[in-house]
Amino acid sequence: MKSNLALLLAFASASAFAVPQVGNVRTAINGRTVNVTYSLADPGEPGIVTFELLYRGEAENAVWTTETSGDINKLVDPGSHSFSFTVADGCRAPQVGRTGVRLTAWATNAPPDYMVVDLLQGDVRWYVSTNALPAGGLTNDLYRTDKLVMRRIPAAGATFSMGSGPYEISRVAKSEIAHEVSFTEDFYMGVFELTQGQYVNLLGVNDSTWKNEEDSPCRPADTVSMSKIRGTKTWPKDGHLLTDGCLCKILGSRCGITSFDLPTDAQWEFACKAGSDCAFPNGAHQDSNGGAIYGTIKKYGWYNANSAVNGTMQPHRVGEKLPNAWGLYDMHGNVMEWVLDNYSINANYSDGSPVVDPVGASASSDDGKRICRGGSFGASMDKCTSFYREGRGYGSALLGAGNGVRLACRAVVK
């Protein structure tokens, strides 16, 4: 039996682009299926429309839907639209007067927190939280193999202290000089390290060392050369120029988002620290209180003290440890992650002013090496901090299984 469904509306705001508005909403329910129609007012451009499932005015604290179809969680043009969704078993069945749906319209320069790219079809969807991801949310391995989940990092206007403080017991002063960094834009960052399944879906081959395990598709791509990811090695001179046939170029062509690339060194560290200035999540500094630190990193990452299986250290499935405060997994350990910047020591930040949107040194101080971050399954704890950096050869055949990647892109919909 169909009946009206109580509806709550919310509108996102943006400073530069006109914000579309949702109106003329009509809903009907049939068992656990909800059908919704709405219109998007014409501000001169399309907008992203998302939904939340509410119970007594609050978002359900579980994955909301098993599936959705129609014009929702995507970029839509002004006009009339419809969509439907099936409420997941973990949520209460729709009830008139208690259940609500909140529709939100987002400007294209201020998209939702989560973006998901279908690596097979190229479809792009946006979601307000991981609870909005259909079919089980992040627990479904679909989001580790055939889809790529990106998290918007709130960087616009933010300033943070990059590098390590003098209280960190194993700091490498010459490559971790503390300095202020500011950003002018938000950006998206991969929730997970790029997996072998995702790598194969984009490049058609598996170059990883640990590719013959039962769960290999969900393990991070390892033994990854930077040249396979972006091709050209002319950063920062040529910006985000990519070579045809590289992974980022293929991904951008498939989904229409051409800003996919590696993060900069500053972007990676800002995303890793997630609002703190610490070596590890939950405010853990790498000081003399070793017990607390070891306890912290074991909860958040795979490194040389906990990664062994049958006596052999190895990478593990992504997302098995706790995420940081911004929902990013495996920022400490598992595989070391390439960033764009040239590896250079004793960089000069002596003027005291924040460096804005830094792109790194114009050249490497160590034989053309680029920076890798986060440590790996074979690294010691001190090499898995938020500020430790290491130089590796751009296309070296001697990378080892500890090299991987986490993708980034602009948080602006084109």
What is each stretch, according to the model?
Residues 4-13:
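Sec-dependent N-terminal signal peptides
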Residues 131, 137-148, 171-276, 307-330, ...:
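Short aromatic-cysteine micro-motif
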